């Protein structure tokens, strides 16, 4: 049984958006293959939320800026003794390739927006029970198509996100690896520190404590308050050890 729980908290709006996109893309594949109504609604609801996120900001522009920023950071390690130069060069080339693919790709999510079935389901998702067979006969007949035909269509939908997924995965991996976990101690359930221009907080907490963090702040300063899962009977120790990485 897992004894440590990892919490991540964004310290700016772009990181908040990226983590939401990452979460929703991961959710797209959780219940595949789609074999019934429940699996279909899970998939289409996540597609709909993903398109909503895309429409709120310049996702491609921010990712391209970050790909460029990560390349510049890696270039500062070129020629430094003891650093694996081949690894640095490989990462730089991977970032360049991801940027080229992303910049030449169609508008993010456009393929999904233009799909008739996705559009029909999106219109009904906000209506309680609005995806019944009599409301959405299109979805009803789609669910009775051969499994291979549905699988192929789902794979095509997900593949349309590959330029974004590839770039986002690289960026988030590099950010997460940019800082090590360090042991910290909270006093009376409270901890605060300077962020040092961090984009992301990562916090490892023992499951035994049955506590969760409430995090507030921004890239220059943040505060963490630990709360008991059982709000009535749970207790927060005077001193609590945890691991924190400011990435």
Curated annotation (Swiss-Prot):
GO cellular component annotations of the record: cell division site; cytoplasm
Keyword tags: Cell cycle, Cell division, Cytoplasm, Septation
One BP term from GO: FtsZ-dependent cytokinesis
Main function: Cell division factor that enhances FtsZ-ring assembly. Directly interacts with FtsZ and promotes bundling of FtsZ protofilaments, with a reduction in FtsZ GTPase activity.
Protein family (similarity comment): Belongs to the ZapD family.
Assembly description: Interacts with FtsZ.
The protein's name in its UniProt record: Cell division protein ZapD
Organism from which the protein derives: Escherichia coli O7:K1 (strain IAI39 / ExPEC)
Source species taxonomy: Bacteria, Pseudomonadati, Pseudomonadota, Gammaproteobacteria, Enterobacterales
This protein's encoding gene: zapD
